Swiss-Prot record:
Extracellular-side positions: 254-255, 329-334, 414-415, 489-491
Stated name of the protein: Solute carrier family 53 member 1
Catalysis: reaction(s): phosphate(in) = phosphate(out)
Entry keywords, A to Z: Membrane, Phosphate transport, Transmembrane, Transmembrane helix, Transport
Positions bound to phosphate: D389, N392, K466, Y467, R555, R586, R587
Region described as Important for inositol polyphosphate binding: spans on this chain: 152-159
GO cellular component term of the entry, any: plasma membrane
The keyword Cell membrane is annotated on this UniProt entry: no
Length: 671
């Protein structure tokens, strides 16, 4: 692998601009060679002057790159030093908890697990040290990659120009640079390993390193997993084509609406899951750090192939169940046993309490889902409102769940539906507005909670108003459908016009918010990226234009649906079954740009690891910190109001903000 590819594969995405610009420097070298005057056509002195001028420009560029790297490394090293001091202080406090101070120090310093320390405190310390260690490894990787980059490019310089100026410049400047000579990062890593081994894991280094280990950057996927994804995906495609052909020629029987509603929700879930896997692949390939954005464990999380594997396996099961439903009579099995079996398997997989089948990922999903349902009572993180947005694209699945509960609760036999199907259709129509509003309510409640925590009316109250418009759309649609007997013609029904007006307003509101707020497009400083933003992650600008147009079309797809249904060309259930997968696809495209926008926010803050707080923090503290971070120099200016000893205290603080000296440990600095 060439170094340029190695660098691209191993950089920390949030620090991308702070690395050596290896490609630009290599392009400068090749351009200089191509544009150099020919020694056969001009005097040798002119060639010498040309390369001397180029070397001046090239090494000036190297100076700028070196200064950039030194500055960033020093800032991150100082940040790591302060962070370790804080963690070490919390650990010392926890170690002394529950022991009288009169005891000797060696008796007080026993492992956390054997002391009277709250389990939550121990867990927070373990997580904080683990995340801090990851940040140290990323910084060490930054140090090594940049030194290797300078060594490679200067060696290439000497080889192409047949000189040794690059080697001498490396010796005089790079090998004497602060980012290379400073070894505090190695000492911090060693002291962190020692603290976790001795004070948290009771001297068990193997267990400590298992907790701290960082997965190899650019780790390859298991060939066995790749094989299974290909096998089950191919099988699903074949079976899906078979299902379509069988449905066209044999149909779903007399109660086709019941069959359609039974299999629609699982298909949407499977489609959504598979497209999430494609999302993860796209994010990873483009350098969007979804692991950080969702605050996943960087040492243990599902890859795109793991997600696709689960989706493709359930896709095969879904197709087999549909075929069993269609051919129930020749097979001699109860017709409605197939959908019940499908739902049972999916529920058993999700709720399986054993530590099998990606248990950590499943428990994470369940925990986030509970937080979504409890939206007004929980602090809202990115994963919470992202999942709630996904649920807003799966309203038909929500509508089918009450039907299933009613159907299997009333049906005396699994062979034939009887009157249960028609009764449950009427039953669901009464619950329709309540169930349809639920996903929008979850996001509405989250926005209100975020406003309560941050006291910022924009964007949170404005975003809440966007979801509130969905309430009116559902209510007016329900009133229209319940008054069709009173008003035989739609144009005579006043609720029809209320419904249309609310739907148009809601769609325009949602589309504008998608493009401007969620995706950050139509930036006035977009420059060459017309109608987009100044910085884009994905390689093709046409992908962004496709997303803008596709989102507009699918946001207003209800107009086509309403026209065809009102004209009597198609049944409502059939139209919903066709449009529901398209809405999931719209959300799939939306996910790319939403996470890109969040990723660029992290890049602006150089945030590459999770911010784990060990000390308890209430919402007011968190709100204050968020506001200070949003303000220019907000954290530095927070002491300006203090009159007594202001200047001397500032001077003292500046003296204390230093890196470790050679031979000095973190504990010496904190003591």
């Amino acid at each position: 692998m060439k170094f340029a590819e190695h660098l691209t594969a191993h950089i920390t995405p949030e620090w991308r601009k702070q690395y050596i610009n290896y490609e630009e420097m290599k392009a400068m070298l090749y351009a200089a060679i191509e544009q150099s005057p020919s020694a056969e056509l001009v005097e040798r002195e002119m060639v010498t002057r040309y390369f001397a001028k180029f070397d001046e420009e090239f090494f000036h560029y190297c100076d700028k790159e070196l200064a950039k790297i030194n500055t960033f490394y020093s800032e991150k090293m100082a940040e790591a030093t302060r962070k370790y001091g804080s963690l070490r202080s919390e650990l010392t406090e926890a170690l002394e908890m529950g022991h009288p101070k009169k005891l000797p120090a060696w008796k007080r310093r026993t492992p956390l697990g054997k002391k009277n320390v709250p389990a939550r405190k121990i867990q927070d310390l373990k997580l904080a040290f683990s995340e801090f260690y990851l940040g140290l490894i990323l910084l060490q990787n930054y140090q090594n990659l940049n030194f290797t980059g300078f060594r490679k490019i200067l060696k290439k310089h000497d080889k192409l120009l047949s000189v040794d100026y690059g080697a001498r410049w490396r010796t005089d400047h790079v090998e004497a640079a602060h980012f290379y000579t400073n070894k505090d990062i190695d000492r911090l890593i060693q002291e962190t390993e020692q603290a976790v081994t001795q004070d948290i894991e009771g001297g068990d280094r193997q267990r400590a390193m298992k907790r701290l280990r960082v997965p190899p950057l650019g780790e390859q996927q298991s060939p066995w997993t790749t094989f299974k994804v290909g096998l089950f995906s191919g099988a699903f495609v074949v079976l899906f084509i078979t299902v379509v052909i069988a449905a066209m020629f044999y149909g779903f029987g007399e109660n086709w609406r019941a069959g359609m509603r039974m299999f629609r929700a699982p298909f949407l879930i499977i489609e959504c899951l598979f497209l999430w896997g494609v999302n993860v692949y796209g994010w990873r390939s483009s350098g969007v750090n979804h692991v950080l954005i969702f605050e996943l464990d960087p040492r243990n999380h599902l890859s795109e192939q793991n997600i696709m594997e689960v989706a493709s396996v359930f896709g095969v099961i879904w197709a087999c169940c549909v075929l069993s439903y269609i051919f129930c009579d020749p097979l001699g099995i109860p017709q409605y046993a197939a959908p019940l079996c499908l739902y049972t398997l999916m529920a058993a997989f999700l709720l399986n309490p054993t530590k099998t089948f990606h248990h950590e990922a499943r428990f994470w999903a369940i925990r986030i889902l509970i937080r979504v349902i409890m939206a007004p009572f929980c602090f809202v993180n990115f994963a919470d409102f992202w999942l709630a947005d996904q649920l807003n694209s799966m309203v038909p699945a929500f509508l089918d769940i009450p039907f299933l509960i009613c159907f299997f609760g009333r049906s005396p036999t699994w062979h034939k539906a009887g009157k249960a199907a028609s009764h449950c259709v009427e039953y669901v129509s009464l619950l329709h507005p309540i169930v349809a509003i639920m996903p929008a309510y979850f996001r509405f409640a989250q926005c209100i909670r975020r406003y309560r925590d941050t006291k910022e009316s924009f964007p949170h109250l404005v975003n809440a108003a966007k979801y509130a418009t969905s309430f009116f759309v559902v209510i007016f649609a329900h009133k229209y459908h319940t008054t069709t007997d009173t008003y035989p013609l739609s144009k005579e029904n006043p609720w029809f016009y209320c419904w249309i007006t609310a739907a148009i307003f809601s769609s325009c509101y949602a589309y504008t918010w998608d493009i401007k707020m969620d995706w950050g497009l139509f930036d006035s400083k977009a420059g060459d990226n017309r109608f987009l933003r100044e910085e884009i992650v994905y390689s093709s600008t046409w992908f962004y234009y496709f997303g803008i147009i596709e989102d507009l079309i699918l946001r207003f797809s209800w107009t086509l649906s309403m026209s065809l249904i009102e004209a009597g060309y198609i049944e409502g259930d059939v139209m919903m079954t066709i449009l529901s997968p398209l809405e999931v696809f719209r959300r799939f495209i939306w996910n790319y740009f939403r996470l890109e926008n969040e990723h660029l926010n992290n890049v602006g803050k150089f945030r590459a690891v999770r911010d784990i707080s060990v000390a308890p923090m209430d919402c007011s503290d968190q709100t204050t910190i968020l506001r200070m971070m949003d303000e220019t120099d907000g954290v530095l200016n927070r002491r300006r109001g203090k009159a007594a000893g202001g200047k001397s205290a500032t001077k003292k603080n500046k003296q204390e903000q230093r890196l470790l000296l050679q031979g000095e440990s973190i504990e010496d600095l904190c003591s």
